[in-house]
């Protein structure tokens, strides 16, 4: 049966959303399996949590160099090469016989991640129907949210009953299946508007874009100061069961899907207010993490709001980058991906230090302090650069 060009375009967007799903499942799998990995290597959760920092900082440091090295490559073949490295590295993660082998395997996953996220958002915009670009980005974000709502809880269930190693091997096998789908669905995609090293000085002369990058690293650091250690927090501070921990991760991810839907509906109407409110709600959630940990119901409610906020603001910042750098999208998104992951790594490291010197219960307060500062800076940025930031991605 012959498909219409519009349905074909949506199938391609869906295929990239599935790719986003498996990449984000792999990135955040250690969050759901932290205690099990720590027990396997006779280490503490805080020590093992550093693999999140290492992974994120490899992505942060390598996103732009990897993108520039591949800037002239045809995108379909580049995606296939990325998936081959990704699948092999995940299988090796599952087979890791010591902590250092696990780190090396995770670095392989991180390198594939660095290239994937530097090109994928712009590819989705390019492949989407002409009048549905913001919705296509929202669908890509849904792939990310599904990694939280399905990938992390299912990965945790598999790890709980079959061992954490099986989780990583399964991720590698699923990635291979998605790769075959991409090979069949995607057309030849010559590099377009990728930019080059010459684009970098031009981007760095755009103060509004630099502010968006700065806000990104601040709010992501705040989020991951607490979220990197949410599993041991639920188990050891909230004193909830392992099964309820899985349910909370499911709730958090489901809230991310709601955040994606809210973004699709309201971000164009309220480009400034939508982001500022998202920042503020994230700050409130982190501030209330410990006070509301007294019961499963209160913590579940908090996770719903938290999940909505982080997804909404992540999407909002991504659209601002694409809008402010439409002439060099791949370079701009490589920088965004790198900066986002520097925030992830910084948050995981800051959380590690909070646990070491203050205690696990205080991770929310430290994250909240960062988030409040980020919210104030967000308001200032939108006031200062309102003429360029109060725009949306419409074409």
Curated annotation (Swiss-Prot):
UniProt keyword list: Cell inner membrane, Cell membrane, Membrane, Sugar transport, Transmembrane, Transmembrane helix, Transport
A GO cellular component entry from the record: plasma membrane
Listed InterPro entries: MFS, MFS_dom, MFS_Efflux_Transporters, MFS_trans_sf, Sugar_effux_transptr_put
Location in the cell: Cell inner membrane
Main location: membrane
Ranges annotated as spanning the membrane: 13-33, 48-68, 82-102, 107-127, 134-154, 168-188, 207-227, 244-264, 272-292, 297-317, 331-351, 363-383
Signal peptide as annotated in the record: none
GO molecular function, one term: carbohydrate transmembrane transporter activity
Pfam families linked to this entry: MFS_1
Membrane topology: Multi-pass membrane protein
CDD domains: MFS_NepI_like
HAMAP family, sorted: MFS_SotB
Known role: Involved in the efflux of sugars. The physiological role may be the reduction of the intracellular concentration of toxic sugars or sugar metabolites.
Family per record: Belongs to the major facilitator superfamily. SotB (TC 2.A.1.2) family.
Protein name stated in the entry: Probable sugar efflux transporter
Protein species of origin: Pectobacterium atrosepticum (strain SCRI 1043 / ATCC BAA-672)
Lineage: Bacteria, Pseudomonadati, Pseudomonadota, Gammaproteobacteria, Enterobacterales
């Amino acid at each position: 049966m012959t498909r219409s060009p519009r349905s074909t375009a949506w199938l391609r967007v869906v295929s990239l959303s599935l790719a986003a799903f498996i990449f984000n499942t792999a990135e955040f799998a250690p969050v759901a399996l932290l205690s099990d990995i720590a027990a396997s290597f006779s280490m503490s959760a805080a020590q093992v949590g550093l693999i999140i920092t290492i992974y994120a900082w490899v992505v942060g440091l390598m996103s732009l160099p990897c993108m520039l090295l591949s800037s002239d490559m045809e995108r379909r073949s580049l995606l296939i090469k990325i998936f081959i490295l990704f699948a092999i590295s995940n299988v090796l993660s599952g087979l890791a016989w010591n902590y250092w082998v696990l780190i090396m395997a995770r670095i392989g996953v991180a390198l594939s991640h660095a290239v994937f996220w530097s090109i994928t958002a712009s590819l989705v915009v390019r492949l989407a129907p002409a009048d549905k670009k913001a919705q296509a980005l929202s669908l890509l974000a849904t792939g990310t949210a599904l990694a939280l709502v399905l990938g992390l809880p299912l990965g945790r269930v598999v790890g709980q009953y079959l061992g954490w190693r099986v989780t990583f091997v399964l991720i590698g096998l699923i990635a291979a299946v998605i790769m075959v789908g991409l090979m069949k669905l995607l057309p030849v995609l010559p590099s377009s508007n990728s930019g080059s090293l010459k684009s970098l000085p031009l981007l760095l002369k755009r103060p509004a874009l630099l502010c968006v990058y700065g806000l990104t690293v601040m709010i992501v650091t705040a989020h991951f100061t607490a979220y990197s250690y949410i599993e041991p927090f639920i188990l050891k501070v909230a004193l909830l069961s392992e099964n309820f921990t899985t349910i909370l991760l499911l709730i958090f991810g489901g809230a991310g899907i709601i955040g994606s839907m809210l973004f699709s509906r309201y971000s164009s109407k309220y480009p400034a207010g939508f982001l500022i409110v998202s920042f503020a709600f994230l700050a409130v959630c982190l501030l209330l993490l410990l006070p509301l940990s007294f019961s499963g119901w209160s913590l579940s409610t908090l996770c719903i709001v938290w999940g909505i906020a982080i997804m909404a603001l992540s999407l909002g910042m991504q659209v601002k980058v694409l809008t402010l750098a439409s002439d060099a999208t791949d370079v701009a998104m490589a920088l965004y991906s790198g900066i986002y992951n520097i925030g992830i790594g910084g948050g995981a490291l800051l959380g590690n230090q909070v646990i070491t010197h203050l205690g696990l219960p205080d991770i929310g307060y430290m994250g909240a302090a960062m988030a409040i500062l980020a919210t104030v800076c967000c308001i200032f940025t939108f006031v200062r650069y309102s003429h360029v930031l109060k725009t949306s991605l419409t074409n």
